[in-house]
Regions:
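C-terminal, well-folded lobe of enzymatic/effector domains
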Residues: 209-232
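Residue-level marker of intrinsically disordered, low-complexity segments enriched
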Residues: 11, 17-18, 24-25, 65
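N-terminal export signals
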Residues: 1-14
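Beta-strand-dominated extracellular/periplasmic modules and repeats
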Residues: 36-197, 203-204, 230-232
């Protein structure tokens, strides 16, 4: 499996500038409009998912916090905490975390017409609290998939310990709906034809360990927080 990296963002404004703070529990089918992140209290392993079809070719060359590159869109600050089930879910300091996702139009770098680009892909090493942070843009979507971010976690020595994906909460006032309605910021697809988590070919079996917490607004940008439980 490969790993990942990421590009830059622009801040955006539209009429739906409501603060989102989606922290209530999500059901296993992902149908709730709110969500909860994995916590260390239950120490349940995060679901393993496919890295494909667009994994990063050489993630070790993309060590960076700001992964936006030349991509524009609504800013999304991502904070991921890596917990080690093998150590009673203590933070896994030094874990290498690769992330990657599509741009606002559903395109991935390194593939198709973007083979010479590496936007929206990046790697960071977890600090003493098991945390990594990235600055990116709010992902768009493409046919057959709900909004998501790919993650590949390694130990500091390079052992692969988790390949997974991050799901986003859904609902009428969710960030997903607000962002995809923000044509002023270049999100032109809207929600017509969108694949929800419950019908997604990756998330349809449940998203309880993959659901992020997303808060913020169109004008100020959004923040995503999520915990991933792996076993070293």
């Amino acid at each position: 499996m490969s790993a990942f990296a990421f590009p830059l963002l622009t801040r955006c404004i539209d009429e739906s500038d409501t603060i989102i703070d989606e922290t209530s529990t999500v059901t296993d089918d992902g149908s709730s409009s709110t969500n909860s992140s994995t916590t260390s209290s239950d120490c349940t392993l995060t679901n393993t998912e496919t890295a494909g079809p667009y994994p990063t070719h050489s993630p070790g060359s993309l060590v960076r916090e700001d992964i936006r590159g030349d991509r524009t869109g609504i800013e999304l600050d991502v904070e991921i905490t890596i917990l080690d089930q093998s150590q009673s879910c203590l933070p896994l300091e030094g874990a290498l975390v690769d992330i990657w996702h599509c741009d606002k139009d559903g395109n991935y770098s390194e593939y198709s017409g973007y083979t010479s680009s590496s936007f929206l892909r990046g790697r960071q090493a977890a600090d003493e609290n098991g945390k990594v942070a990235f600055t990116t843009i709010f992902p768009g979507w493409y046919n057959g998939r709900a909004t998501h971010i790919h993650v590949h976690v390694y130990t500091a020595s390079g052992k692969s310990i988790k390949v997974t994906q991050i799901a986003f909460p859904e609902g009428s006032n969710s960030a997903v709906v607000q962002v995809n309605s923000s044509t002023a910021n270049g999100y032109t697809k809207g929600m017509s034809g969108y694949t929800y988590n419950s019908s997604d070919n990756v998330f349809s079996d449940g998203v309880s360990t993959e659901m992020a917490i997303v808060s913020g607004s169109i004008s100020e940008g959004f923040k995503l927080t999520h915990s991933i439980v792996a076993a070293s």
